[in-house]
Curated annotation (Swiss-Prot):
Transmembrane segments: none
Protein name as catalogued: Probable secreted beta-glucosidase UTH1
Recorded family membership: Belongs to the SUN family.
Signal peptide residues on this chain, from the entry's feature table: 1-17
Alphabetical UniProt keywords: Autophagy, Carbohydrate metabolism, Cell cycle, Cell division, Cell wall, Cell wall biogenesis/degradation, Glycosidase, Hydrolase, Membrane, Mitochondrion, Mitochondrion outer membrane, Polysaccharide degradation, Secreted, Septation, Signal, Stress response
Length: 362
């Protein structure tokens, strides 16, 4: 199938984080939501959708899947679209993410598991009812509602940043685990290679909101539960950084690089209502109308606008990827009036070879 909007991904391998099934307290789970396709954008129904996985999975009506998808993204270089250099003002963030990131090193064994480490740069997600944590999971896939001994307590970071903590030894069944480890009632790093809890991404993308309502963009808790609970809220007329994962040095899933995935709710949906595991037909969370992808590898930033197979309805805004002043973006990518650029339903990806680009909501 000819995909005029398809871009070269230069033989890199990448896994696009996808949300796991919703789980209750102390419930073991092995299922994952779909991470789709290889070489071409293919969804569970065989339609071309998004570059992410080398094993297609079939999604049930409730958004669960029956198998775990691995991922190798290899897009043909012959499908690269024309290079564009677009002028677009890069708005400054409405709030400084660095102010909440925290500059102090995390000290093992000094903070109780019952206390959320807000002063260390982690962002508390109070609406989830987990004491501020994004998820709480042990190596066997059991979950809990409070951070306790033997569990990994995963957390969110400010927009533009990603967590640094996950154990090098991961479950053999394809699940991912991340966060601080609770032992003897105290929190410990699960990745002792770094003393900080959050790391800045590549800094090559922002979300720019030109519509009248706030937009809750919800990143997946990855490695971890993979639920879409990590918030980036972009107020009307403002902008926020998008965390572009530095794939070459970040978490790898079974030896494959991973990028970031964001579920975008309709404008006007609050973060408390939108950055959750949604229910069928709700239009929020994993049922949000559009998904974004972002990753940086081998000197190139890749940005995507992706259909959500759970929700075929168009959002109450349009979206396009636009180069910032002086930047170079290969390809064109937009979702306007319910139609993606290119074939109309496949989603689209651009490569930023220099500078940065904006996801513009209008």
């Amino acid at each position: 199938m000819k995909l005029s909007a398809l871009l070269a991904l230069s033989a890199s391998t990448a896994v696009l984080a996808a949300p796991a099934v919703h789980h209750s307290d102390n419930h073991h789970h092995n299922d994952k939501r779909a991470v789709v396709t290889v070489t071409q954008y293919v969804n569970a129904d065989g339609a071309v959708v998004i570059p992410a996985a080398n094993t297609a999975t079939s999604a049930a009506a409730d958004g669960k899947v029956e198998s775990v998808a691995a991922a190798t993204t290899t897009l043909s270089s012959t499908a690269a679209a024309a290079t564009t250099s677009a002028a677009a003002s890069s708005s400054s963030s409405s709030s400084s993410s660095s102010s909440s990131v925290g500059s102090g090193d995390f000290e093992d064994g000094t903070i109780s598991c019952s206390d959320f480490p807000s002063g260390q740069g982690a962002v508390s997600l109070d609406w989830l009812g987990l004491g501020g944590w994004a998820s709480i999971m042990d190596m066997n896939g059991n979950t809990a509602t409070s951070c306790q001994d033997g569990y990994y307590c995963s957390y969110a970071c400010s927009p533009g940043y990603a967590k640094t903590q996950w154990p090098s030894e991961q479950p053999s069944d394809g699940r991912s685990v991340g966060g601080l480890y609770c032992k003897n009632g105290k929190l410990y790093r699960s990745n002792t290679d770094t003393n900080s809890l959050c790391v800045e991404g590549q800094g090559s993308a922002q979300a720019v909101n030109k519509v009248s309502g706030s937009i809750a963009i919800c990143g997946t808790d990855y490695p971890g539960s993979e639920n879409m609970v990590v918030p980036t809220v972009v107020g009307a007329g403002s902008s926020q950084p998008i965390n572009v994962i530095k794939e070459d040095s970040y978490y790898q899933w079974q030896g494959k690089k991973t990028s970031a995935q964001y579920y975008v709710n309709n404008a006007g949906v609050s973060v408390e209502d939108g950055c959750i595991w949604g229910t069928e037909g709700s239009g929020v969370g994993n049922w949000a109308p559009v998904v974004l992808g972002a990753g940086y590898t081998d000197g190139i930033t890749y940005l995507s606008i992706i259909p959500n197979p759970n929700n075929k309805e168009a959002p109450n805004f349009n979206i396009k990827i636009v180069a910032t002043d002086g930047s170079t973006v290969n390809g064109a990518c937009s979702y306007e009036n319910g139609v993606y650029s290119g074939s109309g339903s496949d989603g689209c990806t651009v490569s930023v070879t220099s500078g940065s680009a904006n996801f513009v909501f209008y």
